[in-house]
């Protein structure tokens, strides 16, 4: 290896010729302990207008494992022309994601070895030779000491993950969640809390935890508890399928001791009457592990019926899963379970590209903001005298029903879907079952053509409606087009895996941060096969003002206040404002104040909000019609990368982004002219969130990326591609070339004018018309330019001529 000339080797060559031999010689197994090009993130989805694109992410060059699922070290390699430690910082970031203490950086000359387990006084980073790469046993021993594992823990900690043979492996955060939970349980911790954002695979994570504890014989009888039938069925039929005949779903209020894995609804094993408490059929020590799904909903509450199950099996290890731990005076997830062993937030999920970003459209209705007061002695549709007071947003569809308001909301939803796609899966969150039924009826009446095609276009899916509940599986199935619109109150707030939901409508009073996060979670799942990369929230009840709460950890891409008329009117500028962001001069407006909070306090309780379905009939509700319901003015707002509410056009975003990189026009043009391929700069700026199609729509001209940036960022007069091509011809620039070369360059200039610089930078353009009539690609190059270098030089000079800037006055 010492005789190998490294100086001209690429990064890939360094890995193949230097790194892999060093690792293998140290005793690492290529099948089970070494993975190359490990992609840890998916790449954040950037939404600009109607275009969504993923940000390109790098992969860890090599990750070393004790065994699959237990990572130990990260190796980052660079070409030999770089300094030996060039990849260290990149490697440290990957190590943080994987929670490993060892990082190796190399350029082929040796390794810089970063050892976070080093004792005080020892070097954290040191250089070692290729021959001194540590063995698997050496790193595992250091790792175990760093983690503080005992001998008794090791059989549990090293238990294999379930492998279905498909190559599917847990994502980095799932690995951390699983491994940290296993560590805690094997160390004797009996109450464990795991917090993972909706849509990040909590159930799959729970399966791997249970599988490893069960297979290692650490836990023999396991109870998985949920409070929705669909959650139990989804779990049994999907992630938990490998348990096979060892698993059962508790039914008939009977716990069968013949099974080891029991899946149960809380309601199926307990109730207010003693004979309903099926959990008492077995001894208190029957289960040694209980996993509680969506544990924020009651298991941590001392007076909850669910809590008596946990208290009865108090000797069992209890693991709580939730996206939203609940912390109020009455209920505390952390008081019961302790601090989370791991947290993966909505914000992290969106940043990593595992969850969908979203836009917000706020619709303000005049009676909501200004209130409505009955005339003296006015009666409602049932002949009841209406209490004389001002009814406002908190009252509507709770204690006061105004038919015109319901119809306006339904019409706005319909108009929005017509502008986007009438077949986009939509969930409408209503205040109660009665509201959900009225909303269903209003939407049916406003969509006769769609309902004629399929009478399940709109369905009410609530706890009281067996027909509606029977359609829930079809609604969440991406392959089933119907139902399209689901109106609901409580049933679909949690646990419903609606991957293709593209529109979430809020016509519900939501003051609970817990519930708000759960509802937002209905849309955050990504399904690229069906084109679902982002979604929209249509908010009629100011629920999205909870974004301003410091406890909310996943800011929206954009927020827009609008009117039903703007959504309905095809001639309005609603789409432009939503998709392109209305322009404001940057110096004039850099931010706006958050709108005033509603006249009630945001808490983390559900005291005011949608009614529990069993309590609806206890509330006195007035029902009126004939009320004039109108709209108010609109405003457009967006959240920036730091979560601050600003008013900014996409031009402003582009300006800020470019000025960070290139402070002056000279800096930018120098970089542009010096680049061998302009496409590289175009691609680099795309990675920073600049989407050319959207910028072109805002600028409104057929401009080259170079001109768009010079115009928008530096105030230069814009030239179209055709104008630039004509300017080159006017300068008689071609005369220094042979006739054959002039013909090629003249046609390249036409190609540039038609399609842009990226088109002419590909050598394959010479295979297209009209070049194909001039000969084969090698013939064209040889006849006109001598060789490939001559052609590249001529192309570079042509680009310099194209992008020549006019002289500027001092």
UniProtKB/Swiss-Prot annotation:
Tell me which residues make up the Helicase ATP-binding domain.
183-343
The alphabetized list of GO BP terms reads: DNA restriction-modification system
Q: Where does ATP bind?
A: 197-203
Task: Please give the residue ranges the record annotates as the region Disordered.
Answer: 578-608
Residue ranges annotated as compositionally biased, kind Acidic residues, are 578-588
Catalytic activities: Endonucleolytic cleavage of DNA to give random double-stranded fragments with terminal 5'-phosphates, ATP is simultaneously hydrolyzed
Q: What does this protein do?
A: The subtype B restriction (R) subunit of a type I restriction enzyme that recognizes 5'-GAGN(7)GTCA-3' and cleaves a random distance away. Subunit R is required for both nuclease and ATPase activities, but not for modification. After locating a non-methylated recognition site, the enzyme complex serves as a molecular motor that translocates DNA in an ATP-dependent manner until a collision occurs that triggers cleavage.
Question: What's the protein name?
Answer: Type I restriction enzyme EcoAI endonuclease subunit
User: Which organism does this sequence originate in?
Assistant: Escherichia coli
């Amino acid at each position: 290896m010492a005789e190998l000339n490294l100086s001209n080797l690429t990064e890939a060559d360094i890995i193949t010729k230097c790194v892999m031999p060093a690792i293998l010689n140290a005793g690492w197994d290529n099948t089970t302990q070494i993975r190359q090009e490990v992609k840890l993130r998916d790449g954040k989805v950037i939404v600009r207008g109607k275009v969504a694109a993923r940000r390109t992410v790098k992969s860890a060059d090599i990750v070393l494992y004790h065994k699959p699922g237990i990572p130990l070290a990260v190796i980052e390699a660079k070409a030999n022309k770089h300094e030996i430690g060039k990849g260290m910082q990149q490697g440290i970031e990957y190590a943080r994601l994987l929670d490993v203490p060892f990082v190796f950086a190399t350029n082929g000359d040796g390794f810089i070895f970063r050892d976070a387990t080093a004792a005080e006084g020892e070097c954290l980073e040191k250089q070692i030779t290729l021959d001194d790469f540590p063995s698997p046993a050496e790193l595992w021993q250091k790792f175990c000491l760093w983690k503080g594992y005992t001998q008794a823990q090791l059989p549990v900690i090293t238990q294999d993950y379930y492998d279905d043979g498909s190559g599917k492996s847990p994502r980095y955060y799932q690995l951390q969640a699983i491994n940290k939970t296993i560590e805690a349980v094997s160390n004797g911790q009996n109450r464990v809390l795991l917090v993972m954002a909706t849509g990040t695979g909590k159930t799959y994570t729970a399966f791997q935890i249970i599988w490893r504890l069960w297979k290692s014989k650490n836990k023999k009888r396991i109870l998985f508890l949920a409070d929705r039938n669909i959650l139990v069925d989804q779990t049994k039929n999907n992630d938990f399928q490998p348990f096979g005949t060892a698993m059962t779903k508790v039914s008939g209020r009977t716990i069968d001791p013949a099974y080891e894995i029991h899946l149960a609804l809380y309601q199926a094993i307990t109730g207010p009457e003693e004979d309903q408490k099926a959990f008492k059929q077995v001894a208190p020590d029957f289960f040694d592990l209980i996993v509680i799904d969506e544990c924020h909903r009651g298991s941590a509450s001392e007076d909850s019926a669910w809590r008596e199950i946990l208290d009865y099996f108090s000797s069992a290890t209890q693991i709580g899963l939730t996206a939203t731990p609940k912390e109020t005076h009455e209920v505390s997830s952390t008081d019961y379970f302790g601090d989370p062993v791991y947290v993966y937030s909505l914000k992290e999920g969106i940043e990593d590209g595992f969850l969908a970003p979203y836009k917000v459209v706020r619709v303000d209705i005049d009676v909501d903001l200004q209130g409505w007061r009955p005339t003296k002695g006015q009666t409602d549709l049932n002949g009841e005298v209406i209490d004389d007071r001002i009814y406002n947003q908190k009252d509507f569809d709770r204690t006061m029903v105004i038919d015109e308001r319901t119809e306006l909301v339904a019409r706005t939803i319909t108009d929005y879907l017509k502008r986007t796609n009438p077949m986009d899966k939509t969930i409408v969150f209503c205040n109660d079952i009665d509201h959900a039924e009225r909303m269903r009826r209003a939407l049916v009446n406003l969509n006769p053509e769609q309902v004629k095609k399929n009478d399940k276009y709109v369905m009410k899916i609530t706890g009281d409606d067996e027909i509606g509940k029977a359609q829930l599986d079809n609604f969440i199935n991406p392959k089933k087009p119907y139902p399209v619109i689901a109106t609901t109150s409580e049933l679909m707030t949690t646990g419903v895996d609606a991957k293709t939901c593209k529109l979430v409508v809020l016509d519900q009073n939501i003051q609970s941060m817990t519930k708000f996060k759960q509802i937002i979670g209905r849309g955050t799942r990504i399904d690229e096969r069906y084109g679902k990369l982002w979604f929209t929230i249509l908010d009629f009840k100011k629920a999205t003002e909870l974004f301003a709460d410091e406890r909310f950890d996943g800011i929206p891409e954009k927020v827009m206040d609008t009117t039903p008329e703007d959504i309905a009117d095809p001639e309005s500028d609603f789409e432009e404002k939503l998709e392109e962001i209305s322009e404001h001069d940057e110096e004039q407006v850099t931010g706006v104040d958050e709108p005033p909070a509603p006249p009630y306090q945001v808490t983390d309780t559900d005291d005011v909000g949608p009614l529990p379905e069993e309590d609806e009939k206890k509330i006195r509700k007035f029902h009126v019609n004939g009320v004039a319901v109108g709209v108010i003015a609109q405003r457009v707002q967006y959240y920036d990368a730091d979560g601050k509410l600003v008013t900014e056009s996409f031009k402003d975003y582009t300006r800020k982004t470019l000025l960070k990189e290139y402070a002056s026009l000279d800096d930018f043009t120098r970089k542009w002219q010096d680049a061998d391929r302009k496409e590289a700069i175009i691609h680099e700026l795309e990675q920073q969130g600049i989407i050319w199609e959207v910028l072109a729509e805002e600028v409104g001209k057929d401009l080259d990326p170079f001109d768009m940036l010079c115009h928008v960022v530096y105030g230069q007069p814009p030239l179209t591609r055709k104008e630039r091509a004509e300017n080159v011809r006017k300068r008689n620039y071609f005369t220094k070339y042979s006739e054959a070369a002039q013909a090629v360059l003249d046609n390249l200039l036409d190609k540039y004018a038609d399609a842009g610089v990226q088109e002419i930078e590909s050598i394959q353009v010479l295979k297209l018309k009209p070049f194909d009539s001039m000969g084969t690609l090698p013939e064209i190059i040889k006849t006109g330019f001598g060789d490939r270098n001559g052609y590249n030089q001529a192309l570079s000079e042509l680009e310099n001529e194209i992008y020549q800037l006019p002289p500027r006055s001092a």
